[in-house]
Amino acid sequence: MKKAIVIDGNSLIYRAFHATYKQAEWAVEKQLMPTNAIKLVASMIFKILNQEQFTYGLIAMDASKQTFRAQEYAAYKATRKPMDAKLIVQLPYLKKLFVAMGFRIISQPGIEADDFVGSFSNLMNKFDVDTTIYSSDRDMLQLINKNTKLKLLKTGTSVMQEINLTNFSLLNNGILPYQIIEYKGLVGDSSDNLIGVKGIGPKTAINLLLKYDNIENIYTNLEKIAPSVKNKLIEHKDMAFLSKKLAAIQTDLLFDEKLENFVLKPYNTQELDELFTSLKINNMQNYYK
């Protein structure tokens, strides 16, 4: 069976950058261009591609902070810090790296990388292609199905946890992938600055979802719910539904694309050589020659 790989580019890059931040500081002190993220991202992806054969591939990137979610809810991701200048200078080289590795890159203003990851996974699913998502973003849990699994980056970049349809419920307190957005609607998501229902924590949210399945059913059955919880649900109803809506990843952005548009190309060894030489990055050739 053919297989596909989709990488949440920003997630991987941020992880790599912060895991090796001292290297970036050292480079700046020596008046050199930081290359810490480039080196770690390159080695990580080379290892993945050299261990498993993929037919199709995509790296999804954020293009801008202003997205349709931010337009609908001004506080969306408002607490996130701007990208570090020591990482910004590495982005053009990272994109060159991805292309030389054979990937197609998708990035579009107004649309988050998550939505392209979801849309790519959905496209692959339609053609029964097994898909692996690489990300540190737990929002991706909602995309897991019989054809799609998530390699969740944990502990910097050194540990990856595989989450699939078989182990999903065990690892997520009994809920299923489609209930991830229901859960976020109730408890919110601090990383995205989604509020959810104030006063409802993970345990209460899980119990509600195990009993009522989704937010709509919870509100239909308010009279059966304990008054202390019911009152919170009533008070923050609008935010519950908004948080759920904003947490949902779009999956229909690539419906008119063809499979062949995402064929993973062989390594372009000449471009890789030139890139690493120009950046004075050594010991990479063993990965691709």
From Swiss-Prot:
Question: Per the UniProt record, which residue ranges are transmembrane?
Answer: none
Q: Which CDD domains match?
A: H3TH_53EXO (cd09898), PIN_53EXO (cd09859)
Residues annotated as domain 5'-3' exonuclease: 176-269
Please state what class of enzyme this protein is: hydrolase
What is a GO molecular function of this protein? Answer: 5'-flap endonuclease activity
A Gene Ontology biological process in which this protein takes part is: DNA replication, Okazaki fragment processing
Q: Which Pfam families match?
A: 5_3_exonuc (PF01367), 5_3_exonuc_N (PF02739)
Q: Which UniProt keywords apply?
A: DNA-binding, Exonuclease, Hydrolase, Nuclease
The record, for InterPro entries, names:
5-3_exonucl_a-hlix_arch_N, 5-3_exonuclease, 5-3_exonuclease_C_sf, DNA_polI_H3TH, FEN, HhH2, PIN-like_dom_sf
EC number per UniProt: 3.1.11.-
Q: Which positions carry the signal peptide feature in this UniProt record?
A: none
UniProt KW Oxidoreductase keyword: no
Function in brief:
5'-3' exonuclease acting preferentially on double-stranded DNA.
Q: What is this protein called?
A: 5'-3' exonuclease
Lineage, broadest ranks:
Bacteria, Bacillati, Mycoplasmatota, Mycoplasmoidales, Mycoplasmoidaceae
